[in-house]
């Protein structure tokens, strides 16, 4: 169960790209707490400097400010690395619709640069962030690998392209790659600010600030919200997975289903705040329902998520109350 007792070689070096972001900084923290070395790479375009500064006093941590769109930077970052955890990407479905060229350059070319740099440097395992958005308009629930629909956004296209490139690097070059199809990850250090903030931290910040949150649509959308600790487990267990599991992508979720309106009222109750939400239009490119079949990750990665939504949301509420 979990990841804290996983064992790697004592001198193992992990490269975490996107290390100043939400998932990346949590991966850095977990690996450092386990006693292993971490090299972080981030251009700080969306990541936060404070998510780097918190580790700079740790002798096992090294930070490179750089852009995955630059191949030489990727080569430098991969020198001597055993495991790559490639989280560097721009998120947000709506923003990708506004900025398709940038998303292609950053999310596709950047990942390809990292794959090639990892290959040339003899990296053992390459674990990368994909997304549940690759399921597109496929209505069948739960979402199962191999049953994908039409893609609904440029962001989804970038993630599917990343998966296809990773498969090629496993097939032709023997690089063990593992795609993490994240389902609505939430938890500590997720940025609540800006027009593209994820719904849980955004609701929490607005409620704690005395604002009235707006729910896009009718609130009856459902998602498989996944606490950050489960995502850390999936990434680290992928680093220990067999080569037979390589060249594939895996649903990383809890396997539950929560409705936005229920989450909203759960947050107001937990915070002791009585305020009705506003309702706005549906977001472009969004699906109505999402729920993951995680049996493949359980079987091939040993993934066994410990953190339910209820347990995770309690931890998230406490973190935001202390840190906003």
Language model segments and positions:
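Generic structural signal for nonpolar/small residues that stabilize regular secondary structure
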Residues: 166-169, 180, 187, 203, ...
